[in-house]
Amino acid sequence: MADTKEMKAVLFGPVLANNPIALQVLGICSALAVTSSLKNALIMSIALTLVTAFSSFFISTIRNQIPSSVRIIVQMTIIASLVIVVDQVLQAFSYATAKELSVFIGLIITNCIVMGRAEAYAMKSPPLMSFLDGIGNGLGYSVVLLTVGFIRELFGKGSLFGVDIIPLVQNGGWYQPMGLLILPPSAFFIIGLFIWVLRTYKKDQVEAKA
């Protein structure tokens, strides 16, 4: 049984110290696609966190019964089943959002973070630790997504969660929204800035020069 210190390291390590996007550069595609609004970023973050946590838990539970030759197929089957559940729940409670995010929710099946944690950690670790690892990596993913979504919606539209925060010029206010931030490439710049700030304070994450 893992001790409390190890559990905390597994749970909180991926948030900043070993962030899946900032350090491992995984899950970039969805970070570009769904962060034009904070609402979409939040829903995607919750969906990926739940799928990563529970898929890692279930895969770890049966890891000793999975033949090595078909382990990837088994992992993807479990992940796909959980993604279908998430998509159906989203359609039941927020159909408009589900319709908008349907393609990206479906792509969680092949998300590098989910597949990576299943193969690299869940196949070698007990269920509880695998579940915590999934939660931790989901939180690390969420931190970046929510940061990008916050900046893009606030300065690109002058709103948060669809509610006007900054008075726009077209509505008689003073702020001229930055249209560039609504475009997907802006997420690249913001993620790059996030990585730069993180590595400024965490020198151990800077790659060694050849």
UniProtKB/Swiss-Prot annotation:
Residue spans crossing the bilayer: 9-29, 42-62, 72-92, 96-116, 131-151, 178-198
Quote any Pfam family the record assigns: Rnf-Nqr
UniProt-listed GO biological process terms: sodium ion transport
Q: Does the keyword rRNA processing apply?
A: no
Q: So which domain of life are we looking at?
A: Bacteria
Tell me, what does this protein do in biology? NQR complex catalyzes the reduction of ubiquinone-1 to ubiquinol by two successive reactions, coupled with the transport of Na(+) ions from the cytoplasm to the periplasm. NqrA to NqrE are probably involved in the second step, the conversion of ubisemiquinone to ubiquinol.
Recorded hits in PANTHER family, A to Z, give: ELECTRON TRANSPORT COMPLEX PROTEIN RNFE, NA(+)-TRANSLOCATING NADH-QUINONE REDUCTASE SUBUNIT D
What is its quaternary makeup?
Composed of six subunits; NqrA, NqrB, NqrC, NqrD, NqrE and NqrF.
> What's the name of the protein?
Na(+)-translocating NADH-quinone reductase subunit D
> Which species is this UniProt entry from?
Pseudoalteromonas translucida (strain TAC 125)
